[in-house]
Amino acid sequence: MRAIIVDDEPLARNELHYLLNQINHFEKIDKAENVSETLELLLYDDYDVIFLDINLMDESGLDLANKIKKMKHAPFIIFATAHDTFAVKAFELDAIDYILKPFEQQRIAQAVHKVEQALGQTTEHHSDSYTTASMDTQNNEKTKTSKVLPIEVNERIHIINLDDIIAVSVNNGITTINTTLDDFETSEPLSHYEKKIETQNFMRIHRATLINKSHIQTIEHWFNYTYQLTMTNQLRFQVSRSYMKTFKQMMGLN
């Protein structure tokens, strides 16, 4: 599973992070201390569950939960707080569980188990129907073999050839798709497009940037042992240090 811990207290974040790691059911656990950091993480990636404190510095966790609930691919929410007075409101927001500080390993394990059951039920719900399963398989095959990407902008769907896509990047909550024909701006997260254009030509070079390597024009050495890429449309992107190893491997630069 993939999770985010949202708490403005570093000690609480670190404690919960440690306890979740002991359960060993998570492939990724990110941490955020406020609403803006949380929303930024949700733009870049998909998560299964958010452990959310209620009293945050910049906004109430209840308000954040309401925003998350409206998202297309909303993760499950577990409130993790020192106060039990908001429990009713939390469950009105469809929280899957509500755990109190100080945290107990057994209680956290129970909450995680609820999420696993819910994720499993979602899978079973789809697999129970032959028709649904068949359609899902067909859709998955289309996604894998499709050479076009539909992009919806202002209630109009543009059909773009994958070969024409130069880069996809996120800035201030807006996802921009640069193509050889035009640039398109949407509110879909980067992970949405990463899944749809999962081919050997596309790679992440930064948490906020996905590029088509066939449109790289030049590679220059940059600060902190990284690279700057100039694309065929003359846009420049930096390869972040955390993606350097993968980039070198995919470009045969090792």
UniProtKB/Swiss-Prot annotation:
List the InterPro entries hit by this protein, alphabetically. Answer: CheY-like_superfamily, LytR-like, LytTR_DNA-bd_dom, Sig_transdc_resp-reg_receiver
Q: Which gene encodes it?
A: lytR
Q: Which NCBIfam families match?
A: PRK14084.1
Q: Where is the Response regulatory domain?
A: 2-116
Q: Which PROSITE patterns does the entry link to?
A: HTH_LYTTR, RESPONSE_REGULATORY
Q: Which UniProt keywords apply?
A: Cytoplasm, DNA-binding, Phosphoprotein, Transcription, Transcription regulation, Two-component regulatory system
**Looking at the UniProt record for this protein, which Gene Ontology cellular component terms does it annotate, in alphabetical order?**
cytoplasm
Q: What does this protein do?
A: Member of the two-component regulatory system LytR/LytS that probably regulates genes involved in cell wall metabolism.
- What are the residue boundaries of the HTH LytTR-type domain, all occurrences included? 149-253
SUPFAM superfamilies referenced in this protein's UniProt entry, alphabetically:
CheY-like
- Provide the positions where the record notes the PTM 4-aspartylphosphate: 53
**Principal subcellular localization:** cytoplasm
**Protein location:** Cytoplasm
**Region entry Disordered: which residue ranges?**
120-143
Summarize what the UniProt record says about post-translational modification. Answer: Phosphorylated by LytS.
- A Pfam family: LytTR
**Name of the protein in its database record:** Sensory transduction protein LytR
Give the GO molecular function terms: DNA binding; phosphorelay response regulator activity
State where composition is biased (Polar residues): 129-138
Q: Which CDD domains match?
A: REC_LytTR_AlgR-like
**Source organism of this protein record:** Staphylococcus saprophyticus subsp. saprophyticus (strain ATCC 15305 / DSM 20229 / NCIMB 8711 / NCTC 7292 / S-41)
